[in-house]
Amino acid sequence: MKQIYFLLVVLISFNLKAQSKKIKIIDSISFEPVPFATIFFSNNNGIISDEDGLFELIPEQYSKKDSLFVSSMGFEPKQFSLDIFNDSIIRLVPKTISLKNVVVTNNQLSSNEIIDSVKLYIDKNYNFNITENKLFFRQEFNQELEKFKLNKFKSTIKDLTAESMDRMTDNLPKKSKNELESLSYYYVNSNIDAPKIKLIKSRRTNDDNESDLSKSLGDKLEKSLRENLKSNSYFKIRSGWLPFSGDLTFNGLWEIDSTNQDQLNKLKEEEVKRKENFSIGQKGRIQSVYLKSFFNPNSELNFILKSKNYIFSDSELTYLGNELVYVIECYPKRGDKYKGTIYVNSDDFAVVRIDYENIKPLSKFKLLGVSFSSNLEKGRMVFSKFENEKYSLSYYQNSRGNNISIKRPFKIIEKNKFVKGRKKQNQISAKLDFASSSIYNTELQVFRVRSIEETQFEEIDEKNQVLPIYLEEFKKDFWEGF
């Protein structure tokens, strides 16, 4: 399996027909990144840089004949011809005089009139057909370890002593980051609450920020478990009066006998299940993005459909790319958790962009030494015209912050039914004192939308055979050819 994986990586790295690359947008004076800048092409496709000013230029988005336009509030816009564009950094020049962008019109509408018009034209403006969406979905998880202590540690496994565990926990990386990206066809059917997905390709990238000592201790722990635990054991976990039980399985801890057909069949079944679970997970996460759309009655971004719950600022007219738009600030009157800024096309009253941010904690939980809080969520949704002059979701970006802490005793008890004597084999006990904070970033880009018939939707086979390829570092040619 390792040889096959290595061969795949080699083949990918030598395929040099058209490379994707990461580009950073910075302030030409301060050299600070320019977050959430607008990047669009002459073919009307567009993306937005992330909070670090980064975006990925993927061949699927453009042709060599296209031009690249970059703009951000407070900076002079820039334009490039893609057939000669080879830079990895774009420098935007700050505007020398920052004046309020005011457009004079003889048809000045109030914010409430604009919101009412948005409601009136929702069915006309947005694509509610059954659609096939070719999209790129990226998830980034950043975690900072604030505390990890195992107090009163006891173990019957000879190599797992309190001293060795202290060394291991002291050398855990304080910060970690991993990314998961996938390209897929995602099928939306508004008539049923069951989308479909066909995965094309996926990759996972982790930061290699662990120290050599931490790695060696990890190897020592694995070696100790392999030598002291039996592969046919099971375990029970107890935390106070809360018991749990399950099969003792550690992926890769015990070698598979290539001559044992039962083990090989079990391995194949686990592989099929992993692929199925991965596709189900990706489909559910993408579905949660689409359900966030403002025209979904159950969305928390209900600035339009539940406009009575919000206070709206006076509208301002400005340009978003080449479009003249109304900009309206939204602030909740009572219990709603989000404030927002909506951008409404002045011609057809379609919402083309929504920026949102929470103003209240999203959730809190504290019970029996376990506490969890979700205290941050901010993001952006962009809607663009694809086929039939209808708007569909084209871009989504979201950041969510969580805090978790655990202060609880626990026991892990190894038991085995296949040995003579008592079932209990080993026991580990300790009092866990753990705290961490995390930021979960999500980004979705839609490259193409096309309507399909009901019969085509029903015939879609969801037998996905894709698992993410693990890479230790970012490779710019991974998405080549896709």
Task: List where the protein language model places each region.
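Hydrophobic beta-strand segments
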Residues: A37-F40, L68, V104
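Short, ordered, surface-exposed loop/turn motifs in non-cytosolic proteins
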Residues: K21, S28-N43
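A short, solvent-exposed loop/turn motif at the edges and junctions
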Residues: F69-F80
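Surface-exposed, low-complexity/disordered segments
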Residues: R91-P297, F303-S307, G321, S374-F482
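Bacterial Sec-dependent N-terminal signal peptides
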Residues: M1-K24, I39, L99
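Short Pro-Gly-centered beta-turn/loop motif in secreted/extracellular proteins
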Residues: E56-K64
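Short, acidic Ser/Thr/Gly-rich low-complexity loop/linker segments typical of extracellular
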Residues: N45-F55
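A short, amphipathic beta-strand motif
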Residues: K21-D27, G53-F55, I90, V102
